[in-house]
């Protein structure tokens, strides 16, 4: 079944959620599965079969994640575009899901119904190999919103010297021969541990420009990484940024 099924009606808003690992698609408007975009978004149905964004690239670097894309929908209309990241092991094969909410931008279409965007989500990072998707929601102004689209098609993110640690586990079962290879092959748990991140950084030549390990560990409260043995000796320029964990408080203890 779909994560969120909109059987009919319009103006149904779906914002800032985490929707993934469903047997069907994350958001389904009507009963037809993925509804293809139509030029000018003139069709009707559940949530007016709102067109979804089309993403063209996503890259994480030291400052954040830059995403490019377009939206074709109703002319001269404002939309909230929300971005989501998914681990490769849980992403749908085609249109995306919404495991981790990254942030949003606001765009306004022109007289032909087109909007393009090149935006950087500051201090928000994804791993190489993550699947990125997006939704579009009509922005009515004043904090009010209308119909939300289905998730757009996945694109695969790249990263420039960024690794996101997303588990407190000390397991090392991923491919650590490089940062890119670790993103593509994360092992049985589908996650990246601090041990794996350091090993992959060590095996990725950076010419003295530091790679950066950041954290995004699910759940609240104190995250404790208990290591069973000494972590790898760092042999490349590397920053380990404990302050990057979204719910950190006070100072990280290392």
Question: Model-predicted segments: where are they?
Answer:
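N-terminal, post-signal-peptide segments of secreted/periplasmic proteins
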Residues: 2-254
